[in-house]
């Protein structure tokens, strides 16, 4: 009877183990029915409910009973030997369940669990083994945030030289500015993006000019109050941050420790490094511009070695200065090529609407123009083989490489001109004169006549066309139309490749502005004739002292105001009187030529310099 009592618990456990092994081969529903039947059978074979309960409560007694039963059954039948393996698993399961408490809980946990000795061929459909294995598999780790510096090449160029950042009391923006691109954020999570600037070391620096290097000058100054720049778009979703370039261009640096504008406070002559912080919203409750960045699992900091800079109140390295001027769009005023020029011309040309469209014409490279004070000028003027009489030495001779010049007779106030035949073909490139059948030399005697007759040119245009060199010609063609009398004189000069126009100054008809005995203030009229039919004029006054001396006017005035095609006053240089095209006269006022629009014009006694602009 005692053996039966001792063996009954183990037999019950072996039956349970056998039921467990069957569970791996049959469906869950059939296995549950089989378990119920075997439970009823086990309760009938048991001696009493008290002994069964005691065995189930005391895991140690059950273990010893089970093990003793296994030892006594040294030579069991083959079926019993086959069940020995599940019996060991049962014992192991009861050891684990013994610490849990009641027998029912242990039994349920054992029945619902998966046996490690299940068939190696795999469990069939509906087996709980795969279902229990799925929750145990590790989930893929979320992608870590990543920050990329934008404009890294420019930062590296500055870093190679030694980046410097200006700091002021009012605050100065950084250049280059911190611009980053963030990836790896949760699109649906809210984030703060912030930036602070921390010291690189505890040293103070100075710049050595002869070696162009920064050297340690001592220990750093006392720490400044911490400041954090929170991006204005914070907080925002990860999707918003990842689809844009995050710029900190509005961040300002200051050396004012009492600053209340939210600027980053730094010491001058110290090295600092910016840091970009990515902070989850649930971790950014303590985020403040005047407090350090909170630390925690949801806070990530990123820094870049090429963004290290030295704070200065004025740039020390000239290479840094030039690089910032060249690359900073807000420093374009320092890139003006004319910033070192002086005078009115630099001031006028700094504005686009004041700039003239054409340059002043000079005759420095034309060998036919005589120089003042030259003793051999008479020989140059008195050429042979020309239609120009020697009695008029003011006219140029037909040298092989000279260009036409236009003058007025000294006693007639008439326009004198040379025919293109007087100027032979020149070997200089670009100087091509078109010969016309109507020669201007035929009109020379009429121009030098003392009578005050009106010169009417032929209907066909008889002007000289010049290809590229700065030779000038006069437009003599005209059409029928009403003529009018003009108190000033104008010439129509044409230069190939430029707008055909002549600008010069003529005194007013009230009197000779160059007379020595004139005491009142005279006025000068500036004309520009745009061939064929556009006339512009401006009037400006001169002082009596300058009017008394024509040489003084020419020598003292380095420039005069002239008209531009847009109608504005421009600053142009005045040539010496003998280097320009002159209009000379000493006689009375005479009508001397017709133009297409001016008709009959009169010329007062004067000496002026004409300039092409």
Curated annotation (Swiss-Prot):
One of the GO BP terms on file: positive regulation of myoblast proliferation
Gene name, Swiss-Prot/TrEMBL: Tbx18
Repeat recorded as keyword: no
Protein name, entry field: T-box transcription factor TBX18
Keyword terms: Developmental protein, DNA-binding, Nucleus, Repressor, Transcription, Transcription regulation
Pfam families, sorted: T-box
MF term (GO), any: DNA-binding transcription repressor activity, RNA polymerase II-specific
Listed PROSITE patterns: TBOX_1, TBOX_2, TBOX_3
Motif range (Engrailed homology 1 repressor): 18-28
Matching InterPro entries: p53-like_TF_DNA-bd_sf, T-box_DNA-bd, T-box_sf, TF_T-box, TF_T-box_CS
DNA-binding region: 149-336
Subunit annotation: Homodimer. Can form a heterodimer with TBX15. Interacts with GATA4 and NKX2-5. Interacts (via engrailed homology 1 repressor motif) with TLE3; this interaction represses TBX18 transcriptional activity. Interacts with PAX3. Interacts with SIX1.
Compartment annotation: Nucleus
Role: Acts as a transcriptional repressor involved in developmental processes of a variety of tissues and organs, including the heart, the coronary vessels, the ureter, and the vertebral column. Required for embryonic development of the sino atrial node (SAN) head area.
Organism superkingdom: Eukaryota
Lineage, top ranks: Eukaryota, Metazoa, Chordata, Craniata, Vertebrata
Annotated Gene Ontology cellular component terms: nucleus; RNA polymerase II transcription repressor complex
Stretches that traverse the bilayer: none
Region spans: Disordered: 37-94, 114-145
Knockout-associated phenotype: Deficient mice fail to maintain anterior-posterior polarity, resulting in abnormal dorsal-ventral polarity of the somites. Mutant mice display neonatal lethality and abnormal morphology of vertebrae, ribs, spinal nerves and coronary vessels. Besides, mutant mice develop anomalies of the urinary tract, including hydroureter and hydronephrosis.
Residue ranges, compositional bias (Low complexity): 114-132
Keyword Cell division carried by entry: no
Motif Nuclear localization signal: positions: 36-40
SMART domains: TBOX
């Amino acid at each position: 009877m005692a053996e039966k009592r001792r063996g009954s618990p183990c037999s019950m456990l072996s039956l349970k183990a056998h039921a467990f092994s069957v569970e791996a081969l049959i469906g869950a529903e059939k296995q549950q029915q089989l378990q119920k039947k075997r439970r009823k059978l086990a309760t009938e074979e048991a001696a009493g409910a008290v002994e069964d309960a005691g065995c189930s409560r005391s895991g140690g007694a059950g273990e010893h009973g089970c093990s003793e039963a296994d030892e006594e059954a040294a030579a069991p039948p083959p079926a019993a030997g086959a069940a020995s393996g599940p019996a060991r698993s049962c014992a192991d399961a009861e050891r684990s369940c013994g610490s849990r408490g009641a027998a029912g809980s242990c039994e349920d946990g054992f029945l619902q669990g998966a046996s490690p000795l299940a068939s190696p061929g795999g469990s069939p459909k509906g087996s709980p083994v795969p279902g229990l294995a799925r929750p145990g598999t590790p989930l893929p780790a979320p992608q870590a945030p990543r920050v990329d510096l934008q404009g890294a090449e420019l930062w590296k160029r500055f870093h190679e030289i030694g980046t410097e950042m200006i700091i002021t009391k009012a605050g100065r923006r950084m250049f280059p500015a911190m611009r980053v691109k963030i990836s790896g954020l949760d699109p649906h999570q809210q984030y703060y993006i912030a930036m602070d600037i921390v010291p690189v070391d505890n040293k103070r620096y100075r710049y050595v000019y002869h070696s162009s290097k920064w050297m340690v000058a001592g220990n750093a100054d006392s720490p400044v109050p911490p400041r954090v720049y929170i991006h204005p778009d914070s907080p925002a979703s990860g999707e918003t941050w990842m689809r844009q370039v995050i710029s900190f261009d509005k961040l300002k640096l200051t050396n004012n420790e009492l600053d209340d504008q939210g600027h980053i406070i730094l010491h001058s002559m110290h090295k600092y490094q910016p840091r970009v912080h990515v902070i989850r919203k649930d971790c950014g409750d303590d985020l403040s511009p005047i407090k350090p960045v909170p630390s925690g699992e949801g806070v990530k900091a990123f820094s870049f070695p090429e963004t290290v800079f030295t704070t200065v109140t004025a740039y020390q390295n000239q290479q840094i200065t030039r690089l910032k001027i060249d690359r900073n769009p807000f420093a374009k005023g320092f890139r003006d090529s004319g910033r070192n020029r002086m005078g009115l011309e630099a001031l006028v040309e700094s504005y686009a609407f004041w700039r003239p469209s054409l340059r002043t014409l000079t005759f420095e490279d034309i060998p036919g123009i005589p120089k003042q004070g030259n003793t051999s000028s008479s020989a140059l003027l008195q050429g042979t083989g020309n239609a120009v009489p020697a009695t008029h030495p003011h006219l140029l001779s037909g040298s092989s490489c000279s260009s036409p010049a236009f003058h007025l007779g000294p006693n007639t106030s008439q326009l004198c001109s040379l025919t293109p035949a007087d100027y032979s073909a020149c070997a200089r490139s670009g100087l091509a004169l078109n010969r016309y059948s109507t020669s201007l030399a035929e009109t020379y005697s009429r121009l030098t006549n003392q009578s005050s007759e009106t010169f009417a040119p032929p209907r066909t245009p008889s002007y000289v066309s010049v290809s590229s060199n700065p030779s000038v010609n006069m437009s003599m063609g005209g059409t029928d139309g009403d003529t009018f009398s003009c108190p000033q004189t104008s010439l129509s000069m044409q230069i190939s490749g430029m707008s055909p126009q002549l600008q010069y100054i003529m005194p007013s008809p009230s009197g000779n502005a160059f007379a020595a005995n004139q005491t009142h203030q005279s006025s000068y009229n500036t004309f520009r004739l745009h061939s064929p039919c556009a006339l512009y004029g401006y009037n400006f006054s001169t002082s009596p002292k300058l009017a008394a001396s024509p040489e003084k006017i020419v020598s003292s005035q380095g420039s005069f105001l002239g008209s531009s095609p847009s109608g504005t006053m421009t600053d142009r240089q005045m040539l010496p009187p003998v280097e320009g095209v002159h209009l000379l006269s000493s006689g009375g006022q005479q009508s001397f030529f017709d133009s297409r629009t001016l008709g009959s014009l009169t010329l007062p006694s004067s000496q002026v310099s004409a300039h092409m602009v």
